Amino acid sequence: MFKFTFALALCVLAAGLVLAQHNPHWWGNRNTIVHLFEWKWEDIAEECENFLGPRGFAGVQVSPANENIVSPGRPWWERYQPISYKLITRSGNEEQFADMVRRCNEVGVRIYVDVLLNHMSADFVGQAVGTAGTEADPAVKSFPGVPYSAEDFHPSCEIYDWNDRYQIQHCELVGLKDLDQSRDWVRTKLIEFLDHLIELGVAGFRVDAAKHMASEDLEFIYGSLSDLKIEHGFPHSSRPFIFQEVIDHGGQEVTREEYNSLGAVTEFRFSQEIGNAFRGNNALKWLQSWGTDWGFLSSGQALTFVDNHDNQRDGGAVLTYKSPRQYKMATAFHLAYPYGISRVMSSFAFDDHDSAPPQDAQEELISPEFDADGGCANGWICEHRWRQIYNMVGFKNAVRDTEISNWWDNGDSQIAFCRGSKGFIAFNNNMYNLAEVLQTCLPKGVYCDVISGDLINGSCSGKSVYVGDDGLGFVSIDSDDFDGVLAIHVDARI
């Protein structure tokens, strides 16, 4: 009887740990993450204090914090080729990283680190040197900065067949030296690395290339991590939030369902389908059933995004900053519809797949500069600073814990819906005007459309909508309007 009770207790404890890894530890009603791709730590700290905190963002996904290989021209992907677990990159050193985490936590913005547990650097012509000056010899799988030697890696092989589980989880993804996570030494070093980041105050991790690691190995690693630190504002026994990169468009040998019990999973189907819809390849009316009916993961298990740093470079249906009108509409729908754990992208401009982030003549990252409207210049796109996006972060905060109601569509690509009695949004993706009296579900009053303008000192710089006693309001979105979306909510009442 004792053995049974003890075993049951262990099962309950394990289940609790797994469920806890889905909790992003947001402050208050905040519920949107932004990926500040390739930003420096000092710049992120300032952005948390000056913009993200005041605008109600919940967290930041930051680029890999550990030492990476120095590659000619400094392409973005060098950050995904580890040399050691020293916290020195072009984004800054350990002291700067720790200062960023502390300052962001103090203003209610959590930090999630992109981590590389699957592999180390690929082969390199000449001496491989990292951003901390550490030397390595990837050709013989020697990484003395950890240290790792050949016995810590799977035997070298290439992935030829994406329906072969062994190749996917044992061979080298684009030549990257594939760690053997079943080895005690490898597990120990990975856990030490993640625990060090936890000690510095991070809230969790985005796990790169998770599908290339056996889920049972990841389960052991995640389960061995320390709790988050109470001195950084986390409750007792809080577990790190885990979200895992698992590319699964269906029909895959390794599936997202193998990982979603361990933490959230990146829902790439969301990105593909929302791009299809707002590119006009699918009528918006079908979005009424958005979510699991589309074959997506359950809401609490899905990390959702319009684009990410990888697929924005791959073309196809995925929308990016290069199609700004449709991109803003897709992002507005993403943040208005109650599905998933939302992440928005903050990019730098690129002309080809390998483009480096903005850098100076010495190949050091440069800080973003801001124009008179608060947008970014000098090579940084900063979608999160576009009014249509940061105001939808505020909309999402205002309507948190409400459901969809009063869906309306024209049978094609004009749609509208309420979020409880707190928010209303409408879209026009047709080539003709939308002009309708619609149920907004809001109390009587005049509301500022947070897409076309800001509410500043009681005045709206954009459109406004009058809502009567019956909740009805006249909604107008012309086909040639700068934005094809209108959004109002209780916190934007004039």
From Swiss-Prot:
Q: Which Gene3D superfamilies match?
A: Glycosidases (3.20.20.80), Golgi alpha-mannosidase II (2.60.40.1180)
Signal peptide region: 1-20
Q: Note the InterPro entries from the entry.
A: A-amylase/branching_C, A-amylase_C, Alpha_amylase, Glyco_hydro_13_cat_dom, Glyco_hydro_b, Glycoside_hydrolase_SF
Question: Which CDD domains does this one have?
Answer: AmyAc_bac_euk_AmyA
A GO MF term: metal ion binding
Location within or outside the cell: Secreted
Question: Subunit arrangement?
Answer: Monomer.
Query: What name appears for this protein in its UniProt entry?
Result: Alpha-amylase-related protein
